[in-house]
Amino acid sequence: MLMTKSGDSKNTLYCSFCGKSQHEVRKLIAGPTVFICDECVELCMDIIREENKTHLVKSRDGVPTPKEICKVLDDYVIGQAHAKKVLSVAVHNHYKRLAHGQKNNDIEIGKSNIMLIGPTGSGKTLLAQTLARILDVPFTMADATTLTEAGYVGEDVENIILKLLQAADYNVERAQRGIVYIDEVDKISRKSDNPSITRDVSGEGVQQALLKIMEGTVASVPPQGGRKHPQQEFLQVDTTNILFICGGAFAGLEKIIGSRGKGGGIGYGAEVRDPDERRTGEILREVEPEDLLRFGLIPEFIGRLPVVATLEDLDEAALIEILTKPKNALVKQYGRLFEMEGVSLSFTDDALKSVANRAIARKTGARGLRSILEGILLGTMYDLPGMENVEEVVINGEVAEGRAAPLMTYGPEERAEESA
């Protein structure tokens, strides 16, 4: 039985869990001699979701198997089967190494950091975020383009470790088992193959600065962030067991790989295969360390990232799946927003195809889907809170292409007023 709000103070009902009255909440659900409000229901659902998430990744020795990791990744990330397989094995081996590190001291297993290579919007960041969430370890992201060598204007490399420490609530032990994702590493490539008298503080200099923390060192982290001050007490964080995942689009890398495959060089005399013959993702899968070296990464930096996972371009079918299939799919997110207004939202197949094709045309991959949906739904989301008796909003192909207004279904009262 659903109890709605009443103005009669003598018969006021209260939530049996939080004690709020029916006037302070949206809904009260009645049970045998007890009531529970909508806020407590949401809280209970959050607790259950967290417990289910933790249960999914448990295995015999406490380290999730690659298949378990991949299975959970499938719930959130569409496609990229090869990249998910590579990541699952690498992450499993990393945390198995930590779990059994003290048992076998005769052989020391090295750390395998990961390089993610793929076009913009193919899911590099989402894969790293999802891995950290399902493993319940601290996670932080850094943009390589904002980093500079120590002593120059910009962000210190140590600030990455500070962010990880903050994500771990300043628990040093937890932070030392966390995951760091460094995005846009292709933007810190060496500006030229030839040595220069001018110092490259935001390119090769950043690669040099990252070497130590990626390999394993004790970083002195100022608790307040920013540049170091002599008066500050530093926190000591050992980065040996922190997993570093570096990602980048590496635009133009496929041409370097293609020229190697054809035996040619780079320049006017190079014979490069037409990029339309094969998709970029297929070419990137053939990447070798020498290709990354020619792109502008220094040998030491490449050596710190032994595991390389390449991601494919997303086609129309994959983008439509991304819109609808994952647990936190965009269509479901906007559907929930409309539910808060008491309205259901639906997209026709041709509308989804239109959205996917616009993202492909923009070359933004999955990252561009939200902005496209925002543009389509902006007018509706602006008007809807002030409208009455709207039951359903339907987005079809014409609406998605901006040639028509969204289709709205009204409740009985509105129909009665129209007929009158």
Curated annotation (Swiss-Prot):
Q: Which CDD domains match?
A: RecA-like_ClpX (cd19497)
| Residues annotated for ATP binding in this entry | 119-126
The record ties this protein, via SUPFAM superfamilies, to: Glucocorticoid receptor-like (DNA-binding domain), P-loop containing nucleoside triphosphate hydrolases
GO BP term (any one): cell division
Q: Where, by residue number, does Zn(2+) bind? A: 15, 18, 37, 40
| Disulphide bonds in the chain | none
One Gene Ontology molecular-function label: zinc ion binding
- Which stretches make up the ClpX-type ZB domain? 3-56
**Entry GO CC:** HslUV protease complex
- UniProtKB keywords: ATP-binding, Chaperone, Metal-binding, Nucleotide-binding, Zinc
- Which superkingdom is the protein from? Bacteria
- InterPro entries linked: AAA+_ATPase, ATP-dep_Clp_protease_ClpX, ATPase_AAA_core, Clp_ATPase_C, Clp_protease_ATP-bd_su_ClpX, ClpX_bact, P-loop_NTPase, Znf_CppX_C4
Q: What family does the entry list?
A: Belongs to the ClpX chaperone family.
The UniProt entry, under NCBIfam families, shows: clpX (TIGR00382), PRK05342.1 (NF003745)
Assembly and partners? Component of the ClpX-ClpP complex. Forms a hexameric ring that, in the presence of ATP, binds to fourteen ClpP subunits assembled into a disk-like structure with a central cavity, resembling the structure of eukaryotic proteasomes.
Q: What does this protein do?
A: ATP-dependent specificity component of the Clp protease. It directs the protease to specific substrates. Can perform chaperone functions in the absence of ClpP.
Instruction: Provide the protein name.
Output: ATP-dependent Clp protease ATP-binding subunit ClpX
